[in-house]
């Protein structure tokens, strides 16, 4: 087995540090003073609520289709602000150096509140005890825990790998208009992954979504950890896979400046922060 010499080790370490330096370093005080921060909080709260309401059906066909279509619509509506609606996706954005830890925690809290509110609407406002099909889906495993982990793991892996081009702070989208197709692609990945795992685990692929629905059915806590470790490990592997397979050549304009996509929050966010702080993407890079 060949070992790397010291110069090669230093070069690889330098590349890692350069990538980490491109992460946003805004302080919590700077972030809370910007309107885009609070807009992203509202977008995640409203989006998580609507997504929960439209994706809680027990039907094995309508449920995944509604889940994917609703996600595509919400992603299109909030694509220039924040369109995660899933704590695992927000964690992936943090690992890909697209958001700060403070913003990650804030978005997860907003998603939690929105998901819990949506679950309350499903159980107390939309469900009908006299109609079996109208009851919200329950986080119950229909397979062994190991197989349940596999379904949640691979389903989340596909979703995060698909969305990494949107979450990556160093990624770019050409001006050909391909970014308009991203919400549709995201919706397809969510719907197909949820449909794949529907019969086995319910196709939640979202720890907070499973937790919110389990709160209303106290007898459905057995093997609940599967709905947490499966998506989290799937997220970690997807981020690792994308981080080591993505193209590293950025797109540049006529002035030799890197073009960041409008679908990436860093560009829009940095523009709004410009008047109040000297931190820019140029200095971070």
UniProtKB/Swiss-Prot annotation:
InterPro entries: Aquaporin-like (IPR023271), Aquaporin_transptr (IPR034294), MIP (IPR000425). Keywords: Cell membrane, Glycoprotein, Membrane, Repeat, Stress response, Transmembrane, Transmembrane helix, Transport. The keyword Secreted does not apply. Pfam families: MIP (PF00230). A motif (NPA 2) lies at residues 206-208. One of its GO terms (cellular component) is plasma membrane. Signal peptide: none annotated. It comes from the Eukaryota. The keyword Kinase does not apply. It is found in: Cell membrane. A motif (NPA 1) lies at residues 86-88. It is a multi-pass membrane protein. GO terms for molecular function: water channel activity. The chain crosses the membrane at residues 36-56, 76-96, 105-125, 143-163, 177-197, 225-245. Induction: Transcript abundance is low and expression levels are not significantly affected by desiccation or rehydratation. Gene3D superfamilies: Glycerol uptake facilitator protein. Aquaporins contain two tandem repeats each containing three membrane-spanning domains and a pore-forming loop with the signature motif Asn-Pro-Ala (NPA). This is Aquaporin-6. It comes from Milnesium tardigradum. The gene is AQP6.
């Amino acid at each position: 087995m060949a070992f790397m010499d010291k110069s090669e080790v230093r070069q690889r370490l330098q590349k890692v540090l350069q990538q980490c330096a491109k992460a946003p370093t805004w302080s919590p005080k700077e972030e809370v003073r910007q309107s885009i921060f609070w807009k992203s909080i509202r977008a995640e709260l409203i989006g998580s609520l609507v997504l929960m309401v439209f994706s809680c059906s027990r039907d094995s066909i309508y449920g995944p289709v509604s889940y994917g279509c609703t996600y595509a619509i919400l992603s299109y509506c909030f694509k220039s602000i924040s369109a995660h609606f899933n704590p695992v996706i927000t964690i992936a954005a943090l690992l890909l150096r697209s958001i700060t830890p403070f913003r990650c925690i804030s978005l997860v809290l907003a998603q939690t509140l929105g998901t819990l509110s949506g679950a309350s609407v499903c159980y107390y406002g939309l469900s009908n005890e006299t109609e079996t099909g109208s009851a919200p889906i329950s986080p119950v495993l229909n397979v062994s825990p190991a197989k349940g982990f596999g379904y949640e793991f691979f389903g989340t892996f596909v979703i995060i790998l698909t969305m990494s081009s949107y979450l990556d702070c160093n990624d770019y989208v050409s001006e050909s208009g391909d970014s308009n197709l991203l919400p549709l692609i995201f919706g397809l990945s969510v719907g197909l992954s949820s449909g794949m795992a529907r019969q086995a685990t319910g196709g939640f692929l979202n720890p907070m979504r499973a937790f919110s629905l389990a709160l209303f059915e106290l007898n459905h806590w057995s093997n609940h950890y599967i709905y947490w470790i499966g998506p989290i490990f799937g997220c970690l592997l997807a981020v690792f896979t994308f981080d080591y397979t993505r193209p590293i050549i950025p797109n540049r304009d006529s002035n030799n400046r890197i073009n960041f996509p409008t679908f990436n929050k860093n560009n829009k966010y940095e523009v709004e922060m410009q008047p109040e702080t000297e931190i820019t993407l140029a200095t971070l890079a």
